[in-house]
């Protein structure tokens, strides 16, 4: 009987050890499986986070580059506008300077009226500030033509220069600083654009 008890104890020990080993192996297997799943999920999350970060970095770079390009375009357009405005103002100043010379203006008016007086009566409109000085010069140089149908009048709407109106047709020709400068600017503008063309 003693052997039977010993055998029974040995058997219980053996069965207990086997069961404990089996349970231990199951626990280790499940732990490894769970660890592998956790690592796989972590790697997947890291990959997704890395892809998202790379996309955000690329988007930021693209937006920054687009913003830089737009800023450069705006700067170029601003510089072109400023240069154009400066050129236009300088042109107007130069025309105004030329038109400040009463001798030049009187010669110009006489040349224009010489060809038009044959067709119809004319009204020469001068700016008010230059009227008295220019009227005297024109009266001397035009002489009898004033009796033939040329009338000289002051006009508030002209800063420098003059306007000539054909009485019969009502047509008016504007030789003011602003109009002459605008015509010259329109003529010179394509060349000017070519000179300042940056991009």
Swiss-Prot record:
Give the highest taxon in the source lineage: Bacteria
What InterPro entries does the annotation carry? ATPase_V1_Esu (IPR002842)
One Gene Ontology cellular component term attached to this UniProt record is: proton-transporting two-sector ATPase complex, catalytic domain
GO terms, molecular function: ATP binding; proton-transporting ATP synthase activity, rotational mechanism; proton-transporting ATPase activity, rotational mechanism
Q: Which UniProt keywords apply?
A: ATP synthesis, Hydrogen ion transport, Ion transport, Transport
Q: What is one GO biological process annotated to this record?
A: proton motive force-driven plasma membrane ATP synthesis
Q: What does this protein do?
A: Produces ATP from ADP in the presence of a proton gradient across the membrane.
Q: Which NCBIfam families match?
A: PRK01558.1
Spell out the family assignment given in the record's similarity comment: Belongs to the V-ATPase E subunit family.
The name this protein carries in UniProt is V-type ATP synthase subunit E
